[in-house]
UniProtKB/Swiss-Prot annotation:
Record's protein name: ER membrane protein complex subunit 5
High-level lineage: Eukaryota, Metazoa, Chordata, Craniata, Vertebrata
Main location: endoplasmic reticulum
Subunit record text: Component of the ER membrane protein complex (EMC).
Gene name, Swiss-Prot/TrEMBL: MMGT1
GO cellular component, one term: plasma membrane
Segments on the Cytoplasmic face: 1-3, 64-131
InterPro entries associated with the record: MMgT
Species this chain originates from: Pongo abelii
Amino acid sequence: MAPSLWKGLVGIGLFALAHAALSAAQHRSYMRLTEKEDESLPIDIVLQTLLAFAVTCYGIVHIAGEFKDMDATSELKNKTFDTLRNHPSFYVFNHRGRVLFRPSDTANSSNQDALSSNTSLKLRKLESLRR
């Protein structure tokens, strides 16, 4: 069936639910006026509420489309073993291992380079503040 039919069915169901809520509110206010607050809702309002709820749920289920299988084997058929436990979003390339595990002669020279670049940067900042 056409998707617009199911959307119309959901609309009708929601309208009927709103009407049932309005009817229940009117019945409650009528019961307060007549001082008969211990009576329950009439059966027609209860049936309208249940039927409208069922129609709305039926329409929503058809709008949602096909459900997926709960069994994971259908999803796992398309994946290889290598990609099964592969989570590239957890890869971190900017970590301290690069500094900890490099040879000591390059570490000393890079520290000196970093110190000289830091001092030149500080000097540039001081010059910009003096102006």
